[in-house]
Curated annotation (Swiss-Prot):
It is found in: Membrane. InterPro entries: SPEM1_N. The chain crosses the membrane at residues 26-46. This is Uncharacterized protein SPEM2. It comes from Homo sapiens. One of its GO terms (cellular component) is membrane. Its main location: membrane. Residues 476-490 have a biased composition (Low complexity). The keyword Zinc-finger does not apply. The gene is SPEM2. It holds the Pfam family Spem1. Keywords: Membrane, Transmembrane, Transmembrane helix.
């Protein structure tokens, strides 16, 4: 019994002792569970952050890779290719109509500057060919007894201004006129005097209408090498031509000096002057019998001109000659001066020098040298003078037969009776010549002192200086009585100091 009670007590004690152990175990378990949960949360948090970082990195890498692939790889759609633009240009050939320009009474700046150096060379070559043709023509036409001129009166360079204006209005045709190219040529056929269909451009802006074949094929109608280009005059507008320019010309062209007050200023090349001087004059200007020409008289009549050539004067200056005085052929006939100055050696030498200079340009006959005819019969002299007057041409723009008229009263008073025997008297009345005031010597055109390149044969002409001298010569010519126009050798300057009443 006692043992049973013992056992029950021990059990109760054991039960009391086991119960706190269970509470501690439960607490430990709870603490363990809390720790485990905390660790699990932390691990889960760490894993989440790690996974989140990994996901972010993967997303960033994927986006960068896509951007790189998008930039490197071509777009998925077909690319727009650049289209080639093909431009076909068709250049039509330019049709050129050569129209005659307005003829000016004197040169201005743009007349001289119209020509380039290349056109000067072409003009020289054309004049050489024209010179050969003119020689043949003059040789063939010397036997022709009729009035024949190499340059007809209606084609003269120094023509009436009203007539030149009318002709310029008839023949002024625009270059780019799209009408019939031969429409203005039909008007030329109706004119009373012939013109070449395609005029040739000459020196100084004039058309030499001498019936020579033209070279328009170089520019237009005949399909020359420059048919597709406009003529050079299109580039020279009036504004450009009036601007000051430097015009260079070689001295082989031998530019002419300016003439006297009454002359119209012209510039001509002495290349053409040599052609005119070498070719014989027209036959109708010759006297019936040159062997009986009076003393000191040229077969060509005179009205008191003094013709100068600047190049020839420079050459004479180098040879020691003096310029022929202007009084040799002014205010009196050459034969009367030859009679008056026969006993004066110096004046006789000057008159012979002026006479030889005029003969070298105007007379190829050596038989016109001074001869003595004081022993001839006056009736024979009068009869031959009448023949002389009949042989002279009827058309006299300057009344050039005035050298055969009666001398002035002063000439009769100065010369004795033997010289009056030589005076021919015609049945018809002759016009009386009134001498004008003596004019000063011609103003020489002095080029500038510049000499580019050191070449002695190369001069520079200033267009402003040229224009100034042209205006000065115009002012002088306007102050003097009007001089009648005529056709002369274009290489020589004309100066008329006598006026016909």
């Amino acid at each position: 019994m006692e043992n049973q009670l013992w056992h029950n007590t021990v059990r109760c004690c054991n039960q009391y002792q086991e119960s706190p152990h269970d509470a501690e175990d439960i607490l430990l378990l709870l603490l363990g569970l809390i720790v485990l949960v905390n660790i699990g949360i932390n691990v889960a948090t760490m894993m989440w952050h790690g996974l989140q970082n990994a996901l972010d990195k993967m997303i960033d890498w994927a986006t960068q890779k896509n951007e790189i692939q998008a930039s490197e790889s071509p777009p998925s759609g077909p690319p727009d290719k650049a289209q080639d633009v093909h431009i076909h240009c068709i250049l039509d050939p330019v049709q050129v109509k050569m129209s005659r320009p307005t003829q000016y009474s004197s040169f201005s700046c743009h007349h001289f500057s119209n020509h380039h150096s290349s056109s000067l060379l072409r003009c020289v070559r054309r004049r050489r060919r024209r010179h050969r043709r003119c020689r043949r023509r003059c040789c063939n036409h010397q036997q022709r007894p009729q009035n024949y001129r190499q340059i007809p009166h209606s084609h003269s360079v120094f023509r009436n201004p009203h007539r030149s204006q009318k002709m310029s209005q008839l023949h002024r045709v625009p270059f780019f006129d799209q009408e019939d190219p031969d429409s203005y040529l039909e008007e030329e056929d109706n004119l009373p005097f012939p013109y070449p269909k395609y005029p040739r451009r000459g020196w100084g802006g004039f058309y030499q209408r001498a019936g020579l074949p033209s070279n328009v094929g170089l520019w237009g109608h005949q399909g020359g090498i420059l048919a597709s280009l406009p003529p050079p005059s299109l580039y020279l507008s009036p504004e450009l031509r009036c601007m000051p320019k430097r015009v260079e010309a070689r001295s082989e062209l031998r530019l002419q000096s300016y003439g006297r007050h009454g002359s119209q200023s012209r510039l001509w090349g002495n290349v053409e002057a040599e052609q005119w001087a070498s070719s014989p004059p027209p036959p109708h200007r010759l006297p019936p019998n040159p062997s009986w020409v009076p003393v000191g008289h040229s077969p060509y009549p005179s009205v008191g001109w003094m013709l100068y050539d600047s190049w020839d004067q420079r050459r004479r200056g180098t040879e020691g000659f003096e310029r022929p005085p202007a009084s040799v052929s002014r205010n009196a006939r050459p034969e009367a001066q030859g009679c008056r100055e026969h006993h004066s050696p110096q004046s006789h030498q000057q008159s012979l020098l002026g006479h030889a200079y005029g003969q070298s340009h105007r007379s190829p006959h050596p038989s016109t040298e001074p001869l003595g005819y004081s022993s001839q019969d006056p009736r024979e002299v009068r009869r031959r003078a009448a023949d002389w007057a009949e042989a002279l041409p009827a058309w006299r723009p300057l009344t050039t037969s005035a050298s055969l008229t009666v001398l002035d009263e002063a000439s009769h008073q100065r010369t004795p009776a033997p010289s009056s025997v030589l005076v021919p008297h015609s049945s018809q009345p002759w016009p009386k010549v009134q001498a004008a005031d003596p004019a000063p010597p011609p103003t020489m055109f002095v080029p500038l002192s510049r000499n580019p390149g050191g070449n002695a044969n190369y001069q520079v002409y200033d267009s402003l200086e040229l224009k100034r001298q042209v205006q000065k010569s115009r002012a002088r010519s306007s102050s003097l009585p009007p001089a009648s126009t005529s056709t002369l050798r274009p290489s020589l300057h004309r100066s008329q100091t006598e006026k016909l009443n």
